[in-house]
Amino acid sequence: MMKRNFDQVKRIVIKIGTSSLVQENGKINLEKIDQLAFVMSSLKNKGKDLILVSSGAMGFGLDILKMDKRPSDLAKQQAVSSVGQVAMMSLYSQIFSHYQTNVSQILLTRDVVIFPESLANVTNAFESLMAMGIVPIVNENDAVSVDEMDHATKFGDNDRLSAVVAEITKADLLIMLSDIDGLYDKNPTIYEDAQLRSIVTEITDEIIKSAGGAGSKFGTGGMLSKIQSAQMVFANNGQMVLMNGKNPRDILRVLEGKEIGTWFVQEKGN
């Protein structure tokens, strides 16, 4: 079996989901954000390029506006996300600054990466920010994204967005933090004997079939979108680690080669 070795990894995209940022009671998980900021700042100080793709605008918005559930009306959803995005970035900026790290905000819609000119502009922005030692924090621009057939500008969810960001920035590794330990051979919430897959070298039909089901009440991404993200990463000859986000310091252990989560990597020659 292939051995994990991330010594040559220079550019890392980390994706954190709403379930890792917002607690079950709807309150923001400050401890986790602090850990994440510490880890990313430590890696930046070692010369790595870091990009964070962060969900959570809706969760932050619901908390600030004291709403206990996501509105069903699209315009209201966009309003709540818009409020939450400001709060989320404010908190990120504050906490990252404790570790002498500056952050920036990049809000994307799908059409930005489809058109060559806007894609070149956003790619240049990423490169400039990282050259200045700044950590770009990326989210979908929920207030203007639409999902209509004639003008679809949504990525679908931030799992797929993180794979797109990894592609356009030519990242060496995508680390996806989730509320699960990785990819299992069957659903661990149903089957007690479900086994965690340490490595996946090929996305088979069987894996896709076993990855049904949706996400948490605050987020949108389920296991299927993570598998689709891995497919996108493979299409660009990249690699991805899917791991539990409950302890962001585990990112450092993963990069040391510890077998945490599921490592998606193609065998040489594929």
Swiss-Prot record:
GO terms for molecular function: ATP binding; glutamate 5-kinase activity. It comes from the Bacteria. It is found in: Cytoplasm. Substrate binds at residues 55, 142, 158. One of its GO terms (biological process) is L-proline biosynthetic process. It is an enzyme of class 2 (transferase). Keywords: Amino-acid biosynthesis, ATP-binding, Cytoplasm, Kinase, Nucleotide-binding, Proline biosynthesis, Transferase. InterPro entries: AceGlu_kinase-like_sf, Asp/Glu/Uridylate_kinase, G5K_ProB, Glu/AcGlu_kinase, Glu_5kinase, Glu_5kinase/COase_Synthase, Glutamate_5-kinase_CS. ATP binds at residues 15, 178-179, 220-226. Pfam families: AA_kinase (PF00696). Belongs to the glutamate 5-kinase family. HAMAP family: ProB. Catalyzes the transfer of a phosphate group to glutamate to form L-glutamate 5-phosphate. This is Glutamate 5-kinase. It comes from Streptococcus uberis (strain ATCC BAA-854 / 0140J).
